[in-house]
């Protein structure tokens, strides 16, 4: 009785009868067959023209098997024809498709190391040392300065001997609070200056006049020779100040070379 009322409602409902295109085309064939099989013989022709949306019709519909022909009409989905509806996401065939990003090899190095651009100066970054910067650092070496006491002791030692052996150089450096390399370099520079001075004064190397001609000429000696003789004498504690004054006046040029300035005498 309920089915008859539903069929009568569907036939008498004019708004639904005016829109036959609202029928579902996918399930039309299977639903119509179910109507012919399950409905009574008298209601089959009547319900065929309507839209089967009754409760009994919906519950009596068979489970539609997956139809591969529905997807075959679309060329971009045809490649998935062999996959079932239940195993689309878990089928082992899915593993055959290349994953996104496989065509891009992974970088083992840092991308910044390949670019090597300095964002401030735009210069190429490299690990090679800069020869210009190395030369600047090497030129920053300053010349050591010595005190008056150290210069006096060095000059006194140089007048006695122009060359120092290893033990003598070490002893002198220790007594003056200097390093052996400083003493060695100072003696090298002092010998160079001494050779230049000797080359510019050839008269000092000429022999003196003998005997009678030079007897009365003893007082005609140059002041520098008198100072040298006075300088070569042993030091006397009572006259050290005078000898230091003569030494500083004689070697005034040495102070200007060492950037110490000349002492007032």
Swiss-Prot record:
Concerning CDD domains, the annotation shows: homeodomain (cd00086)
From the UniProt annotation, which stretches of this protein bind DNA?
139-198
Q: Where is this region: Disordered?
A: 196-240
Read off the Pfam families from this record.
Homeodomain
GO cellular component terms attached to this protein's record: chromatin; nucleus
* Single GO MF descriptor: RNA polymerase II cis-regulatory region sequence-specific DNA binding
Q: Which gene encodes it?
A: NKX6-3
Localization in the cell: Nucleus
For this entry, the protein name equals Homeobox protein Nkx-6.3
What is the originating organism of this protein? Homo sapiens
Q: Which InterPro entries match?
A: HD (IPR001356), HD_metazoa (IPR020479), Homeobox_CS (IPR017970), Homeobox_NK-like (IPR050394), Homeodomain-like_sf (IPR009057), HTH_motif (IPR000047)
The GO biological-process annotations, alphabetized, read as: cell differentiation; cell fate determination; glandular epithelial cell differentiation; negative regulation of stomach neuroendocrine cell differentiation; negative regulation of transcription by RNA polymerase II; positive regulation of transcription by RNA polymerase II; regulation of transcription by RNA polymerase II; stomach neuroendocrine cell differentiation
* Task of the protein: Putative transcription factor, which may be involved in patterning of central nervous system and pancreas.
């Amino acid at each position: 009785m309920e089915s008859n009322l539903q069929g009568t409602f569907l036939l008498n409902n004019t708004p639904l009868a005016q829109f036959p295109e609202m029928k579902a085309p996918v399930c039309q064939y299977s639903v119509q067959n179910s109507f012919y099989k399950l409905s009574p013989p008298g209601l089959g022709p009547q319900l065929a023209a309507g839209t089967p949306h009754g409760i009994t019709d919906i519950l009596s519909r068979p489970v539609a098997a997956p139809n591969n022909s529905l997807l075959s009409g679309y060329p971009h989905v045809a490649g998935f024809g062999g996959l079932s509806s239940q195993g689309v996401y878990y089928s082992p065939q899915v593993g055959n498709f290349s994953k996104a990003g496989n065509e891009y090899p992974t970088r083992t190095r840092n991308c910044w190391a390949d670019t090597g651009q300095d964002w401030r100066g735009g210069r190429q970054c490299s690990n090679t040392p800069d020869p210009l910067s190395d030369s600047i650092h090497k030129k920053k070496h300053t010349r050591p300065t010595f005190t008056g006491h150290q210069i006096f002791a060095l000059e006194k030692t140089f007048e006695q001997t122009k060359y120092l052996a290893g033990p003598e150089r070490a002893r002198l450096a220790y007594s003056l609070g200097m390093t052996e390399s400083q003493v060695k370099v100072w003696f090298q520079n002092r010998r160079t200056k001494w050779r230049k001075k000797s080359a510019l004064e050839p008269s000092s190397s000429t022999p003196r006049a003998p005997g009678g001609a030079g007897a009365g000429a003893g007082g005609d000696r140059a002041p520098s020779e008198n100072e040298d003789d006075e300088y070569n004498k042993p030091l006397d504690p009572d006259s050290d100040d005078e000898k230091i004054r003569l030494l500083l006046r004689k070697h005034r040029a040495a102070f200007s070379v060492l950037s110490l300035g000349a002492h007032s005498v």
